[in-house]
């Protein structure tokens, strides 16, 4: 089962007050409900592929309204042959839709969320919970990117969901998709806040555990990569220094170098694996700092490069014995 499915399953077990149940139901029906007419009856079908969600919608309707309710199961024949669960209402439909602020007399569908319906903070949470159950999704925190979204067919309703989420400072944004619109979150912290808002505590804890472990792994990897890069840089510098010193030795001899450069050159080729700090401690003329050693080695690099380019020892500032 996906992380999103586990999250929704957890939400279907929540105990809520009648007033919050009504708001949750309103969000779900607005987004997943369909109206048809037969023999002067208004029939409402609420459809989902999630059995737990179907049971919850059935139970909420049953608890709130004393009307006959059917629960049907259909088999999808295309692509994934999943079951489709339909909660069907054949009587009292118009009155229920008006009570849920989805319909206005005589038969006009409202396009957005009734502000009075979500005045209380708990009602706002309930509406977002219903919307997420209807058409929400959230990436597994172990995947490459954090992403939570709620899909809506109608732009005005999508904007209302975004505004509702941002009353909780979630920094939600909207985006047009091929067949509708989405309100989405990309920040891990905002996703955990949203899970807390809708009451998905277990999902929140799992998300946070995975996120913390993932962030720790990323930090360790960055540290290792940084240390590896520094180590490679140090090794490459040491190899270059030794090659340059050996070139000076084979062309003009180390004796041609000034004393302070001659001593460090001899120590470097005799101790290829030691650090600059350790080289500084080996000098018989007195301990020199790491930066001081690095400065002398850079001077040796410059001398070697100038000799390679064709300059004479005298031009480089070296004294070569004629004997």
Swiss-Prot record:
* Entry GO MF terms: DNA binding
The answer on whether this UniProt entry bears the keyword Magnesium reads no
Q: Which Pfam families match?
A: HTH_WhiA, LAGLIDADG_WhiA, WhiA_N
Q: Cite a single GO BP annotation.
A: cell division
> Which of UniProt's keywords are assigned here?
Cell cycle, Cell division, DNA-binding
> Which residue ranges carry the DNA-binding annotation?
275-309
- Which InterPro entries does the protein's record reference? Homing_endonucl, Sporu_reg_WhiA_N_dom, Sporulation_regulator_WhiA, Sporulation_regulator_WhiA_C, WhiA_LAGLIDADG_dom
Signal peptide limits: none
User: Function of this protein?
Assistant: Involved in cell division and chromosome segregation.
Which family does the record claim for this protein? Belongs to the WhiA family.
**What's the protein here called?**
Probable cell division protein WhiA
Q: Which organism is it from?
A: Listeria innocua serovar 6a (strain ATCC BAA-680 / CLIP 11262)
């Amino acid at each position: 089962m996906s992380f999103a499915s586990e999250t929704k399953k957890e939400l279907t077990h929540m105990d809520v007050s009648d007033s919050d149940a009504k708001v949750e139901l309103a969000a779900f029906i607005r987004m997943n409900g369909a109206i048809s007419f037969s023999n002067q009856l208004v029939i409402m079908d609420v459809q989902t592929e999630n059995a737990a969600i179907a049971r919850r919608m059935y139970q909420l309707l049953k608890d709130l309204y004393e009307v006959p309710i059917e629960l049907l199961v259909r088999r999808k024949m295309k692509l994934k042959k999943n079951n489709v669960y339909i909660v069907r209402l054949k009587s009292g439909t118009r009155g229920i839709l008006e009570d849920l602020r989805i319909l206005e007399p005589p038969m006009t569908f409202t396009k957005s969320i009734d502000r009075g319906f979500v005045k209380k903070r708990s009602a706002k949470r309930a509406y977002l919970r219903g919307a997420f159950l209807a058409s929400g999704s959230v990436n597994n925190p172990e995947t490459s990117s954090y992403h939570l979204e709620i899909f809506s067919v109608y732009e005005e309703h999508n904007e209302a969901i975004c505004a509702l989420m941002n009353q909780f400072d979630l920094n939600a944004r909207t985006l047009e998709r091929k067949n509708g619109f989405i309100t989405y979150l990309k920040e891990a912290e905002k996703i955990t806040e949203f899970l807390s808002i809708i009451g998905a505590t277990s999902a929140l804890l799992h998300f946070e555990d995975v996120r913390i472990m993932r962030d720790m792994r990323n930090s360790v990897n960055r540290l290792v990569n940084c240390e590896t890069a520094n180590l490679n840089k140090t090794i490459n510098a040491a190899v270059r220094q030794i090659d340059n010193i050996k070139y000076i030795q084979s062309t003009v001899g180390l004796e041609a170098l000034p004393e302070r450069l001659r001593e460090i050159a001899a120590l470097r080729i005799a101790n290829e694996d030691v650090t600059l700090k350790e080289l500084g401690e080996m000098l018989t003329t007195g301990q020199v700092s790491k930066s001081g050693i690095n400065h002398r080695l850079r001077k040796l690099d410059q001398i070697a490069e100038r000799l390679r380019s064709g300059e004479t020892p005298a031009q480089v500032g070296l004294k070569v014995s004629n004997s």
